[in-house]
Each structure stands twice: as structure tokens, then as C-alpha cells.
């Protein structure tokens, strides 16, 4: 035991902080007023999304407004003998922490005879009629979360040493425990460095810079040795994979890895493996058009990374990154992304982030009174922004008329700087613009096709989500009023001759 304790010293130090909220459950030095032969335990599995520590007292804390976690399975093990053996060389806190860090070293976690209970719709799991004493000594129990529903992380193993008592010294016979259930989350937090509300779907424009955050908990035993091992660590894999299955986003940067108020990205740089969809090797590993992977323990110095993470064992970590909406995003197509956190090759925690979508608009420029397509009409796009008229500058367009898939849309008050949009000769929609935010705009015709005149230079419209494939706005031009034949024909000469003859007849 001495060797194992020495090996996990750094991890144990961090674990003691986590175990502190269990200290009230360790035996107090008060006089027992009445003998207790059996005890009941009620576990309250509730969602937690922060570093909040719920102080376990053994009493029902009456917590309300918390989301219960249904479907978690807990096993209970009697670790009395192991606990008292450790007490020969360690104090109670250290002994409890050692068992919590390496429970599989003291019990058979796959023991088919172990009692197992699944949390119900209220997040409760009850263990009834457990012996208060084992072999004449106060019993010590370990609670192990065997099955964890998605997208939650497994709670730390909890060690409870009986008796647990009321303030008056009498034994509690129904002990309430609150295992921490950390939720893996994925959120879009900013668009163009402006905070956005949490919701399931965000409207974006091409060129927008999106900031995402993936949050999860560093395992409380990240630095512990594997069960029954003197030199192999429990965790040899720690990966975060984030990806999109549809095109529309370009990875920009990993901006921060924050835990306990500290940004540890710089300390991890070049110690972990970091790959993005901008790297050539990405497509050989992941068949996704967008994403990144952080392999914390797969780099050149996994021990240094493990030691760093051990300092923050049990804390929530935030991985922040940015992506740019690109021209490949199809209007009205909802694009979501997924985060996966894995601590071993056989299991992963998966969470879906919010979806994003961009908009677009279709126009058909035609001859009035017919469906004849008119090419080479010229337009600019404008909008009103807080009573200021702005004009669209479409970046990255290929110069071909009719279809505009910009890499970015910026807005200027200088009309001369606006991008000139020309219609093609397409027989349906001959002017399309992609990557717009939903909203109100005005298309301004600045030049009609040759031989036609502008009826009304402005067309007000609203880009509405869900209408890209179904709505086309028609804009008509009328032919120029041609009273005289074109120069070079005989019509004008004949007209003048007839006029001269008629005039002569009048004067004769």
C-alpha cells in the first residue's frame, strides 16, 4: 500500500479537495445513544454544470429546481476491511481517498452479487437494509456509478464510513448522498465577438466568426494508477473531438483551455496532439468537412500533461475555439456540430451543439408581360441599419454573373463601393445571393439591360428562413419605346419623302 500511495501522491492531493465534502460522513467522536443495526441510503442524482460542491451532511438537503438524472446505475460495495487496514498507516481522509481513487483495487467492480440500483425519474436510487456493522466494526461503503447516461460524466466513487449522526449524536438511519453528476455541454457563445443567448438554432451570415465552447470535467482520478498496477496509469487516453457532418464552417483557432479561472492552453501547447480540418492529415483520420481533435495524452510528454491536469482534478474545463461561416453553407440548411469526450477507447460522451443556418434570396429578371429572361441587368444590395443606409460588399465572388456565393458580406455607407450584381440568362432564377442573415433588404437596379428601361429601381424584400428553395422574386423591365426604326434603315427616308409630298400637296 505504501508504494501505491507514494505513486499517486499528486493525484491524491487533488482528490482530498474533492473528498472534503464527504468528511462530515466520516465517523464523528460523539456518544452513540442507540444501537443501529441497519441503514438505508438514498442517492440524489441531479445535473450540475459548474464546479459547485454540494456539502453532503447525510440529510435530505431539499434541493429544488435541479434537473434529475434518470437511468444512472449505482453499485454499492462493502469496503470495511480494506478501510480499516489502511487506517493502520493513514488517517481516515487519506484512506477514503485512496479507496475512491482506486476502488477496483479493493473490490471486484464486476461482482455479480453487488447490489445495483438505477435512478428513477426523480434521480433517486435507494439502497435498503444495509448492515451498520461488519465483523464487529462500523461498516464502510463505497458507491460506484457503473452506468452513466449521456451526456453526463461519471461521478467520483463515494466512500461513507458509518455511523453518520444527527447533531444530537443519534445515528441517521436514512442517509442521503448527492453524487456530483457533471454534464458535458457544447454551446455557441459569441458571433463576431458579441455574446449570444443560448438557443437551439442561430442565424448567421457568411463570414461570421463563431465562438464555441465545450465544457466537461477533468476526472477526479486523472493521475491515479490502474487497478492492481504499480506503474500503469488509469487514464492513457483523454481526447476531445469536435466535428460537423455538413460543410459550412472553416476552423479558425483554438483560443483557450480554461480551468479554475486559468488559461492552460500555452502550458499544453506542443505537449498534446492537436489536429484540425485545415490539416492535410485530417481527412485520413476523420471523414468530416470540419472539426478538430485534442489528444491530451497522445503527445510527446503525456506525464507532464497528466501532472498539469492532476492539479485541476475534478474541475470543469472549457475548451474555446472559433470557426468562420464559409461560402459552402447552403441557405436554409441547418448545420449542427457534435463534441465527443473520451477517457478510454471503449467509451465516449457525446453531446450535440446548437445548429446554425444562413439565408439567401432568388430573383428573376424578365421582360414585362412575358417570361423572357433578361441578362446583364445591374443591381446593388442595400439595407437600413439604425436609420443609416448601408450597401453590401460581397467578398470572394468569382465575377460570373447570376450566382453570388461570397466568402464574406460587409456593409459600407459608400454607395460607389457596393458590389455590382449582374443577372445571367438563366431561365428561372437569374440572380441569386447566398449567405444573408434573415432580415429586410432593398435591391436597387442601377442599369437595365440594353434595349430596356427601368420601371422601378427599388425592390424591397425580406429574406425569410425556409424560403430559399421555394421563393423567387420577379422583377420586370419594359422594352424602350421605339417610335423610329434604327439608323441605317429606309424607314426614315421614306417617312420624310411622304411628308414632303403631302406638304407639297397642301401648298399647291
Regions found by a protein language model. Give the residues of each.
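Solvent-exposed loop/turn and edge beta-strand elements of beta-rich ligand-binding domains
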Residues: 2-508
Amino acid at each position: 500500500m505504501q508504494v501505491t500511495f507514494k505513486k499517486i501522491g499528486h493525484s491524491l492531493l487533488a482528490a482530498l479537495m474533492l473528498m472534503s465534502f464527504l468528511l462530515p460522513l466520516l465517523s464523528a467522536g460523539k456518544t452513540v445513544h442507540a444501537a443501529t443495526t441497519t441503514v438505508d441510503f438514498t442517492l440524489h442524482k441531479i445535473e450540475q454544470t459548474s464546479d459547485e460542491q454540494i456539502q453532503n451532511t447525510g440529510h435530505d438537503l431539499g434541493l429544488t429546481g435541479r434537473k434529475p438524472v434518470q437511468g444512472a446505475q449505482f453499485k454499492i460495495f462493502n469496503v470495511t476491511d480494506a478501510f480499516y487496514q489502511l487506517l493502520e498507516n493513514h488517517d481516515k481522509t487519506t484512506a477514503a481517498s485512496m479507496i475512491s481513487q482506486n476502488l477496483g483495487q479493493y473490490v471486484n467492480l464486476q461482482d455479480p452479487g453487488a447490489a445495483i440500483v438505477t435512478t428513477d425519474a426523480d434521480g433517486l436510487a435507494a439502497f435498503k437494509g444495509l448492515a451498520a456493522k461488519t465483523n464487529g466494526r462500523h461498516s464502510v461503503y463505497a458507491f460506484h456509478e457503473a452506468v452513466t447516461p449521456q451526456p453526463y460524466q461519471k461521478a467520483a466513487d463515494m466512500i461513507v464510513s458509518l455511523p453518520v449522526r444527527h447533531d444530537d449524536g443519534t445515528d441517521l438511519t436514512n442517509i442521503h448522498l448527492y453524487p456530483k453528476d457533471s454534464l458535458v455541454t457544447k454551446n455557441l457563445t459569441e458571433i463576431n465577438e458579441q455574446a449570444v443567448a443560448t438557443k437551439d438554432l442561430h442565424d448567421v451570415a457568411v463570414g461570421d466568426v463563431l465562438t464555441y465552447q465545450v465544457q466537461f470535467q477533468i476526472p477526479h482520478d486523472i493521475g491515479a494508477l490502474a487497478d492492481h498496477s504499480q506503474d500503469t496509469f488509469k487514464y492513457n487516453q483523454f481526447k476531445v473531438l469536435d466535428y460537423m457532418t455538413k460543410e459550412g464552417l472553416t476552423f479558425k483557432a483554438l483560443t483557450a483551455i480554461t480551468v479554475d479561472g486559468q488559461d492552460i492552453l500555452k502550458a499544453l501547447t506542443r505537449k498534446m496532439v492537436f489536429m484540425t480540418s485545415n490539416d492535410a492529415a485530417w481527412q485520413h483520420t476523420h471523414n468530416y468537412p470540419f472539426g478538430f481533435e485534442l489528444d491530451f495524452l497522445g503527445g510527446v510528454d503525456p506525464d507532464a500533461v497528466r501532472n498539469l491536469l492532476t492539479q485541476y482534478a475534478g474541475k470543469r474545463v472549457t475548451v474555446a475555439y472559433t470557426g468562420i461561416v464559409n461560402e459552402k453553407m447552403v441557405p436554409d440548411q441547418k448545420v449542427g456540430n457534435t463534441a465527443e469526450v473520451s477517457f478510454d477507447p471503449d467509451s465516449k460522451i457525446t453531446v450535440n451543439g446548437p445548429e446554425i443556418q444562413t439565408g439567401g434570396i432568388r430573383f428573376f429578371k424578365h421582360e414585362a408581360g412575358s417570361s423572357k429572361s433578361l441578362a446583364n441587368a445591374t443591381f446593388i444590395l442595400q439595407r437600413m441599419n439604425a436609420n443609416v443606409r448601408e450597401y453590401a460588399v460581397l467578398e470572394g465572388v468569382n465575377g460570373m454573373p447570376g450566382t453570388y456565393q461570397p466568402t464574406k458580406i460587409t456593409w459600407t455607407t459608400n454607395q460607389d463601393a457596393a458590389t455590382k450584381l449582374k443577372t445571367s440568362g438563366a431561365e428561372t432564377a437569374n440572380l441569386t445571393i447566398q449567405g444573408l442573415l434573415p432580415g429586410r433588404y432593398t435591391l436597387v437596379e442601377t442599369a437595365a439591360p440594353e434595349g430596356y428601361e427601368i420601371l422601378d429601381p427599388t425592390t424591397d424584400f425580406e429574406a425569410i428562413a425556409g424560403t430559399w428553395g421555394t421563393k423567387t422574386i420577379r422583377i420586370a423591365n419594359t422594352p424602350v419605346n421605339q417610335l423610329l426604326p434604327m439608323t441605317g434603315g429606309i424607314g426614315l427616308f421614306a417617312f420624310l419623302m411622304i411628308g414632303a409630298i403631302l406638304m407639297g400637296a397642301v401648298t399647291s
